[in-house]
Curated annotation (Swiss-Prot):
Homodimer. InterPro entries: Class_I_gatase-like, GATASE, GMP_synth_C, GMP_synth_GATase, GMP_synthase, GMPS_ATP_PPase_dom, Rossmann-like_a/b/a_fold. This is GMP synthase [glutamine-hydrolyzing]. Gene3D superfamilies: 3.30.300.10, 3.40.50.880, HUPs. Its EC number is 6.3.5.2. The lineage of its organism: Bacteria, Bacillati, Cyanobacteriota, Cyanophyceae, Synechococcales. Catalyzes the synthesis of GMP from XMP. Keywords: ATP-binding, Glutamine amidotransferase, GMP biosynthesis, Ligase, Nucleotide-binding, Purine biosynthesis. PANTHER family: GMP SYNTHASE [GLUTAMINE-HYDROLYZING], GMP SYNTHASE-RELATED. The active site is at C90 (nucleophile), H178, E180. Residues 205-403 form the GMPS ATP-PPase domain. Residues 13-204 form the Glutamine amidotransferase type-1 domain. The keyword Nucleotide-binding applies.
Amino acid sequence: MSQPSSDGQRQPAIVILDFGSQYSELIARRVRETEVFSVVIGYSTTADELRRMAPKGIILSGGPSSVYAEHAPVCDPAIWDLGIPVLGVCYGMQLMVQQLGGAVEAATGKAEYGKAPLEVDDPTDLLNNVENGSTMWMSHGDSVKALPEGFVRLAHTANTPEAAVANLERKFYGVQFHPEVVHSTCGMALIRNFVNHICGCEQDWTTNAFIDEAVALVREQVGQKRVLLALSGGVDSSTLAFLLKKAIGDQLTCMFIDQGFMRKGEPEFLMEFFDQKFNINVEYINARKRFIDKLKGITDPEDKRKIIGTEFIRVFEEESKRLGPFDYLAQGTLYPDVIESAGTNVDPKTGERVAVKIKSHHNVGGLPKDLRFKLVEPLRKLFKDEVRKVGRNLGLPEEIVRRHPFPGPGLAIRILGEVTDEKLNCLRDADLIVREEIRDAGLYHDIWQAFAVLLPVRSVGVMGDQRTYAWPIVLRCVSSEDGMTADWSRLPYDLMERISNRIVNEVKGVNRVVMDITSKPPGTIEWE
């Protein structure tokens, strides 16, 4: 079982050493789907540090380097003497082979990228329940030339003789493919075999267990002190509000700053939902005029973001002093933010760890240091999908738990060019129609994001035998798993027709609706 450490923090049962793979976080997510707690740490973590962490298993991630390159990242060789099962994935497998006495070479003419059928040679142990011929995702330009002593082949593909290998006695395993990606059809079976059967991990990473632990830790940290939370209405801050309410009750104060860029009816809904229905203390701050005045004449999207962020900080600072004093600031920092700030990424040219600037949480990342808050971040262990599960278990309604992502600057960056009250009213009405029609069609939860964009141009039209010169609205709908990549959603033609007809007929100032059919990449989901 993942036991708490001396500071009350849960210790990971599985640790992933990150060698710079784009899939390292995904490996951790897949392990957690087996109800086992896992974390991503830097590849340079020493064997002594790992011994103190006492994980049940270690996974070596993939990476962009070649193990024979001059500055290739390597793990502490003493790891192989810890007596802990190890699974190497892609680069991780090649590193295992090289450090234990085998050989790796460039796969000249035999590099594999994309899907490949896996031919299973030994269906026991790691490959139990992995079907022969099942599709696995390949992404490698190197291959194993010679196995270390004690290793055997478990599987192969047409171009990769050593697609899966193992030293069964020492419980060292390597796979040249990526079992963590959705394209690998039996990837989860392999991960379960390693985590649950080979490592013997208990399945104790459950939503209810997390809630109980988080509540206890918040109570211990905060005591009788007051906590302030900037509430946006998104799933992260909403889940955090419910968790803190459960932990410390009326010691929590939420501040909802209405900057005037939210969707139609949202401020009223949020105040009724949190303050009246669930008795969470929410201070409503109407700052609409301040924000719209600051954006007068501003057209550059980055300038808009900076101005909105700066003004948010000013309002937050003023109101926190008025409502305070507060000892703690609650933030919805999630685990991907923690990973980025820890700098587990790798520069393939130098082999050095690269620190990536942590993402600022919704609007509060640049709070002045003189506010002197201590931070409460009980969600910092969780991925986004885990936050949704926690919110659901705490009683958040589905309309918030499964709410489409919404940018911090709100509609201000969905209005291209200068933001005015007239444009905001126009876009709110159009955006509401988009969401209503997609919900009525039963497609809302099948789409990652669906919204309207107002362009800073006008087009000629004809309505009631009269010439019109009005704004066009862009319909933007995308499908995605995590927002990192996205494909434009193929909406039914009759649905697009209903949306277009309603917007043109019901929204004053609009005479044309167009569809954005750009995927990400090359485009981004938002226009600004």
